[in-house]
């Protein structure tokens, strides 16, 4: 998993971040019948018409650039600071395509037809992977895309992270590319061979690692100055000089269209204008594009907006071709449709959860939350369908574990679509009572039977311990507060006292995370926190989040079975290992998993193309080369 921990305002509750996260209007959730499981899946909002037949016309397509998402980086070797879906998917990948393309409509899976290479071939006990580049891809200056361009990217990645690991966003120290690669060979112009230091899971390496490789034009970029000679980039000192030159050029936003570096592309579009102040830009088709579908739209124009309100006003006025529907405007969908737009929403492939702190000793919470029945009881108090109806305006999908119920992926286990702990206050009370707690629905439950035997509270929980603890949550967007307020209310109905405490996202991740950033004091007196969530890669292992030593394991969850399953997902050869990992974590509840909100895309009814090319907008992918006007 290439995990991107995010403020909910950026990724977790809205996929696109600021684009959707204006808080929806308040209101209590509409409850399902207590104790009645439901396997009905939500997710889709609106519909996509079939591709129009008949004459196909050209014209300028304008699309809405959400607030705060203006491109700040152009080099396809992306720094951590610029490692965002908007910067990469909507901007860079229109010009430079990754080795393997992922995103097939709403499904987070590989799209072979849009990949620069054929499927990789594994050998040597899953320690060697051979890749054959497709012959159709050429750079815009007519030169072919070769194995040397892949090697160039790899050597520049090594040079970048040698200076600072933050210079490449996908980098995980000791893991994957480049640290686990012993050698890269280019036996032919179309063949690249990666030899690894240890056997890996092929699915993980393809989805998480090879998908981040973006061939770069060595014949045009392997230099250290504008007029300097081409250098041997395989020499580390030269690679460093080249990286410093390219990264400096990437920081010069006002030269994006004048610098000849950025005109050498292999994607469907080239950059024709860029406003460094506003982030507005235009693109035109690359006539040398060797992909499966040449662009029909002659001009793609990104129109920046300073607020969701301004963007929605443009949609309502019909002045933008492709945009989005902010969550707080979901109820105005009929107005949007009457303004001449198609509307379709779907959840992104990510997971949100409330973190449990397994190390918080306040009130013996560490011992309380270590009991599986406690985590199961809390899960029974969350009304996912009610949240989707009341807080998401119906635009959302269930998620009961680290792999959401929707969208489905090749790695979605069968049990991901069924809630193992359906909303039921009665079931929560039953679990607590059967484990030695005295229930007080007008106050706070207490442990009546201390001990580790059947019907007792569990190890380290003294008699008389109250079932009371705090929950720290992010103030933005307001939808988080609505969810945790409802949870606290339902918990009170079962005699569980949850003290809510709000804070801003940056404060939470600075002072309440574990491990804490260097030089910051760590506040460990929190039982639960809701800061947002994680964006899944297409290979959805939770490595780094729920394994014991994970760098993003804020709650110190450490389960030997989970550790073994997560490890097998990455280094084992079992293609279904990640399914077993997800199934166990869904049952074991290392955190309280929450439903996912839809990203709702809108586009003019006279703009058409394959349904998948519009569905993929909900996953923050952009494939305008497939579009055309019908009128």
Ranges and model annotations:
Residues 61-124, 264:
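N-terminal lobe/hinge region of extracytoplasmic solute-binding protein
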Residues 118-165, 187, 193-195, 311-314, ...:
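Aromatic- and charge-enriched surface segment that lines or borders ligand/interaction sites
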Residues 105, 213-294, 430:
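Gly/Pro-rich hinge or "lid" segments in bacterial periplasmic/extracellular proteins
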Residues 37-39, 603-631:
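Long beta-strand-rich cores associated with HINT superfamily self-processing modules
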Residues 257-260, 280-333, 497:
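Ligand-site clamp/hinge motif
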Residues 56, 170-246:
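Surface-exposed binding/hinge segments that line
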């Amino acid at each position: 998993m290439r995990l991107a921990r995010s403020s909910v305002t950026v990724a977790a509750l809205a996929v696109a971040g600021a684009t959707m996260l204006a808080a929806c209007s308040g209101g209590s959730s509409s409850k399902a019948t207590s104790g009645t499981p439901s396997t009905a899946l939500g997710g889709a909002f609106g519909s996509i018409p079939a591709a129009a037949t008949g004459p196909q016309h050209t014209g300028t397509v304008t699309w809405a650039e959400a607030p705060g998402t203006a491109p700040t980086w152009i080099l396809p070797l992306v720094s951590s600071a610029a490692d965002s879906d908007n910067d990469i998917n909507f901007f860079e990948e229109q010009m430079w395509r990754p080795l393997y393309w992922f995103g097939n409509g709403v499904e987070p899976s590989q799209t072979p037809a849009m990949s620069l290479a054929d499927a990789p071939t594994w050998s040597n006990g899953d320690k060697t992977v051979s890749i054959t580049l497709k012959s159709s891809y050429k750079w815009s200056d007519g030169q072919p895309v070769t194995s040397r361009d892949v090697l160039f990217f790899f050597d520049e990645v090594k040079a970048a992270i040698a200076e600072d690991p933050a210079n490449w966003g996908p980098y995980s120290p000791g893991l994957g590319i480049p640290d686990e690669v012993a050698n890269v060979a280019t036996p032919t112009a179309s063949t690249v061979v990666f030899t690894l230091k240890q056997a890996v899971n092929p699915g993980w390496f393809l989805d998480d690692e090879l998908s981040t490789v973006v061939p770069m034009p060595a014949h045009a970029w392997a230099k250290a100055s504008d007029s300097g000679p081409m250098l041997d980039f395989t020499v580390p000192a030269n690679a460093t000089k080249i990286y410093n030159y390219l990264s400096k050029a990437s920081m010069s936003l006002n030269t994006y269209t004048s610098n000849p570096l950025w005109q050498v592309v292999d994607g469907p579009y080239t950059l024709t204008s860029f406003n460094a102040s506003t982030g507005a830009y235009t693109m035109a088709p690359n006539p040398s594009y060797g992909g499966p579908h040449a662009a029909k739209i002659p001009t793609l124009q990104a129109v920046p907006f300073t607020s969701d309100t301004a963007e929605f006003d443009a949609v309502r006025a019909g002045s933008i071709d492709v945009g989005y529907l902010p969550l707080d405007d979901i109820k105005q969908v009929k107005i949007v449709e009457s303004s001449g737009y198609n509307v379709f929403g779907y959840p992104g492939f990510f997971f949100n959860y409330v973190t449990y702190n397994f190390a918080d000793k306040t009130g013996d919470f560490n011992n309380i939350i270590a009991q599986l029945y406690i985590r199961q009881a809390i899960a029974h108090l969350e009304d996912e369908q009610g949240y989707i109806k009341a807080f998401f305006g119906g635009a959302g999908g269930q998620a009961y574990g680290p792999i959401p119920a929707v969208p489905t992926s090749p790695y979605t286990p069968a049990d991901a679509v069924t809630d193992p702990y359906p909303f039921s206050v009665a079931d929560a009370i039953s679990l607590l009572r059967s484990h030695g707690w005295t229930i007080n629905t007008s106050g706070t439950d207490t442990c009546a039977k201390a001990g580790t035997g059947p019907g007792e509270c569990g190890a380290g929980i003294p008699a008389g311990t109250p079932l009371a603890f705090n929950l720290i949550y992010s103030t933005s967007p307001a939808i988080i507060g609505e969810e945790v307020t409802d949870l606290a209310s339902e918990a009170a109905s079962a005699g569980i006292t949850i003290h809510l405490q709000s804070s801003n996202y940056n404060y939470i991740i600075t002072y309440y995370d574990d491990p804490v950033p260097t030089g910051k004091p760590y506040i460990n007196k929190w039982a639960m926190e809701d800061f947002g969530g994680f964006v899944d890669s297409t290979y959805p292992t939770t490595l780094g989040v729920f394994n014991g030593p994970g760098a993003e394991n804020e709650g110190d969850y450490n389960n030997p079975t989970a550790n073994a399953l997560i490890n097998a997902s990455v280094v084992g050869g079992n293609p279904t290992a990640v399914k077993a990992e997800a199934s166990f974590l869904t049952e074991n509840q290392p955190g309280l998993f929450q439903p996912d909100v839809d990203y709702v895309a809108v586009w003019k009814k006279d703009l058409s193309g394959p349904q998948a090319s519009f569905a993929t907008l909900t996953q923050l992918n952009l494939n305008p080369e497939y579009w055309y006007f019908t009128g």
